[in-house]
UniProtKB/Swiss-Prot annotation:
This is Hydroxyacylglutathione hydrolase. GO terms for biological process: methylglyoxal catabolic process to D-lactate via S-lactoyl-glutathione. Keywords: Hydrolase, Metal-binding, Zinc. One of its GO terms (molecular function) is hydroxyacylglutathione hydrolase activity. Zn(2+) 2 binds at residues 61-62, 134, 172.
Length: 256
């Protein structure tokens, strides 16, 4: 089985587009469709034909290009069953535990409500990668537009249980702002300090901070660390449960 090829590129103001390509079958999937024109151009430059669209959730900056790309390529749209009435052009509805294929490469569907109630992520264990949409960000997590803190914490906990080396492809370049907030919550964390300095350098050079890894996020992302004694002490929540601490971190980020 050939190595999966990944093409990452900026879309809109701060989204990332991702094309994944299996050389053996010639199949190509776009992860979400933030900007149809940009995605189609990237596929054309690579010499790839888009055969699948994998949607993570219904927001326009993730599914807004579905109809254009589908009309021009005939691509099959894979999307969460919960969003059957909110995402256009669905060919295959998926839910937690389903497995989809791109050639011989397999992706397991994780249902991850929180940011939205239909959100899913796509974990490709043989390739050591996961496409997580707006659930987990580098040093952050998605805003809770539809779900509860409890639902988001459960979703993040599932992602945190993936192998440490898993490369995490999140859908937005938010890391600089996330780092500033993380340092306000966990200022003495050496791993976070190193990570934040690295991010500052990458962004100064115009480089992406995505992908990240599960290991890096578990060490530095406060949204995955509500059990940390230093964070709990700073919040005055030494005796609260992880879910409550997570909810308070999210509340503070919303007004940061």
């Amino acid at each position: 089985m050939s190595e999966l090829l990944i093409r990452q590129f900026p879309c809109l103001s701060d989204n990332y587009g991702f094309l994944i390509h299996d050389p053996d079958s010639g199949e190509t999937a776009t992860i979400d469709t933030p900007d149809a024109d940009v995605i189609l151009n990237e596929a054309d430059q690579a010499g790839w034909s888009i055969t699948q669209i994998w949607n993570t959730h219904h927001h326009f900056d993730h599914a807004g290009g579905n109809e254009t790309i589908q009309a021009l390529t005939g691509a099959k749209v894979v999307a969460p069953r919960y969003d059957r009435h909110r995402i256009p052009g669905i060919s295959m509805e998926v839910e937690d535990g389903d497995v989809i294929s791109l050639g011989d490469h397999k992706a397991k569907v994780f249902y991850t409500p929180g940011h939205t109630m239909g959100h899913v992520c796509y974990h490709m264990p043989m390739d050591g990668i996961a496409f997580v949409g707006d659930t987990l960000f580098a040093l952050g997590c998605g805003r809770l537009f539809e779900g509860t803190p409890a639902e988001m914490w459960h979703s993040l906990s599932r992602l945190a249980a993936l192998p440490d080396e898993t490369r995490i492809y999140c859908a937005h370049e938010y890391t600089e702002a996330n780092a500033r907030f993380a340092l306000s919550i966990d200022p003495d964390n050496h791993d976070l300090q190193v990570y934040a300095a690295m991010v500052e350098g990458e962004r100064a050079r115009g480089e992406p901070t995505v992908p990240t890894t599960i290991a890096a996020e578990k060490a530095a992302n406060p949204f995955l660390r509500p059990d940390d004694p230093a964070i709990r002490a700073r919040l005055g929540m030494e005796h609260d449960d992880d879910e409550e601490v997570f909810a308070e971190i999210r509340r503070r980020k919303d007004s940061f």
